[in-house]
């Protein structure tokens, strides 16, 4: 079976080139044409997909060459884009930049190559003309199968684009699809795109409407769709895990303004395995969902909402009792900090939180242990026996006095590692974010523990 998925990737020579803005504007422009859009972010970033979903209104997921192999990438693409008229992949960093200097592993290029997705470059055209051809040709020809098919000149007037386009197309063979003017309306000031309240969503959505109008006027969207239609069919079956036998356990998933960083593929994996997801708010709810058989506390910004979290004593107590009763619990990054005794806010004030784990956290002042890690368990636990290997990602500013030591985290391709995380037969908690399609046995272990807990309670 093969799946036809018209698609293209928005990529760039470097970070800060305008990929996210152009991606969001194109998604809105395509949606306004009546097209059903699916969005993907290349790499482990969970903030841009959240922005795609909450502000642009497109379903979105991740495609990551470190986490998964090429067939799995294609299977995830097939599932995430099922029923869509077009899929838009947003690149990360520079097109060839990956997990380490000197290699293109885990880069946007790798995702484009392995999924055979046509690439549209966003290139800053200000103050250059023929030199742009050198940049574009260099990217298009640097490694094989780059599949660069189009370019949009950012921060460039229509006149400058028309002047530069013939030379670019002559020397590169890449179609110039149009320009984005140097317009203050065509920007998103905050790179912390996950920090959007309900009111901000409405305001940002209105701005993206204006961006979409600009794109329709200055970019050849019809030609872009023609390029998307040249993408080969995906031969892999859509990604799906087989359900486990037994009860249909309820997994309570924390989701509100404080906890929102989840890979959509993780939630789908748990549902595939037979779990029922019940979302709750540690900020606003007073108790866990009825029948909860497992807890999933994801990342987010608990430090920005710690006063409200701390003042919600009934929920803190409900979570503490659940964890101490042995309910299977996964707590990642912000969820991990919530389980500890205290969190300091941005002004250094300490607030008591759940207290199921020792430790307190505060702002470390900089990113710590940022990037991909390969985890190896040092003891038996919820995710598997000692020696279980897991691929994950870290991104956090807050530091804990008790980060745990039940796993060893190793930076890939680097001689750097550290102890991290806490695990027991019913708990795994720490800073790393785990991507279940990279580690399906880990997802099965969590779902199986939830099902066993539900069975014991049913017969207990």
Where are these regions (language model features)?
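A short, charged/proline- and glycine-enriched loop
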Residues: 3-6, 244-250
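Internal gly/pro-rich beta-alpha loop/helix module
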Residues: 129-243
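Phosphate-binding active sites in nucleotide-utilizing proteins
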Residues: 247-313, 317-324
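Cysteine-nucleophile active-site neighborhood
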Residues: 302-381
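Structural motif
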Residues: 9, 88-90, 120, 152, ...
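C-terminal and late-domain segments of enzyme folds
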Residues: 112, 217, 244-247, 259-271, ...
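ATP-dependent carboxylate-amine ligase catalytic core
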Residues: 2-115, 119, 123-150, 158-162
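Beta-strand->loop->alpha-helix junctions that form or flank phosphate-binding loops
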Residues: 41-42, 176-184, 276-284
């Amino acid at each position: 079976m093969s799946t036809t998925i018209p698609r293209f990737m928005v990529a760039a020579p470097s970070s800060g080139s305008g990929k996210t803005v152009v991606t969001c504007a194109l998604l809105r422009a395509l949606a306004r044409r009546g097209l059903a859009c699916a969005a993907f972010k290349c790499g482990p970033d969970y903030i841009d997909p959240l922005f795609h979903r909450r502000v642009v209104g497109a379903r979105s997921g991740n495609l990551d060459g470190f986490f998964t192999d090429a067939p799995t990438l294609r299977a995830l693409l097939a599932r995430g884009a099922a029923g869509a008229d077009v899929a838009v992949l947003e690149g990360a960093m520079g097109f060839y930049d990956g997990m380490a200097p000197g290699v293109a592993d885990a880069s946007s290029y790798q995702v484009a190559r392995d999924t055979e997705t046509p690439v549209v470059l966003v290139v800053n055209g200000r103050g250059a003309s023929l030199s742009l051809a050198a940049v574009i040709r260099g990217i298009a020809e640097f490694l094989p199968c780059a599949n660069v098919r189009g370019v949009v000149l950012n921060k460039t007037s229509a006149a400058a684009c028309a002047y530069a386009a013939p030379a670019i197309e002559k020397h590169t063979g890449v179609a110039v699809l149009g320009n984005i003017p140097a317009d203050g309306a065509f920007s998103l000031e905050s790179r912390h795109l996950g920090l959007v309240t309900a009111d901000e969503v409405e305001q940002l959505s209105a701005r993206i409407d204006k961006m979409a109008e600009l794109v329709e006027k200055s970019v050849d969207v019809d030609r872009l769709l023609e390029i998307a239609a040249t993408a080969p069919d995906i031969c892999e079956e859509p990604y799906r895990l087989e359900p486990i036998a037994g009860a249909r356990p309820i997994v309570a998933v924390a989701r509100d303004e404080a906890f929102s960083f989840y890979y959509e593929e993780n939630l789908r994996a748990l549902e595939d395995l037979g779990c029922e997801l019940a979302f709750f708010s540690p900020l606003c709810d007073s108790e866990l969902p009825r029948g909860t058989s497992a807890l999933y506390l994801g990342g987010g910004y608990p430090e920005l909402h710690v006063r409200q979290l701390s003042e919600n004593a009934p929920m803190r107590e409900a979570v503490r009792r659940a964890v101490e009763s042995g309910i299977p619990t996964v707590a990642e990054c912000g969820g991990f900090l919530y389980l500890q005794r205290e969190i300091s806010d941005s002004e250094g004030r300490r607030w008591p939180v759940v207290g199921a784990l020792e430790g307190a956290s505060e702002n470390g002042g900089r990113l710590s242990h940022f990037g991909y890690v390969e985890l190896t368990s040092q003891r038996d636990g919820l995710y598997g026996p000692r020696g279980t290997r897991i691929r994950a990602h870290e991104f956090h500013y807050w530091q804990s006095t008790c980060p745990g030591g039940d796993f060893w985290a190793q930076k890939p391709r680097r001689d750097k590692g550290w102890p991290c995380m806490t695990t027991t037969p019913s708990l795994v908690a720490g800073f790393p974010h785990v991507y279940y399609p990279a580690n399906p046995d880990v997802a099965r272990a969590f779902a199986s523990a939830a099902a066993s807990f539900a069975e014991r309670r049913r017969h207990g």
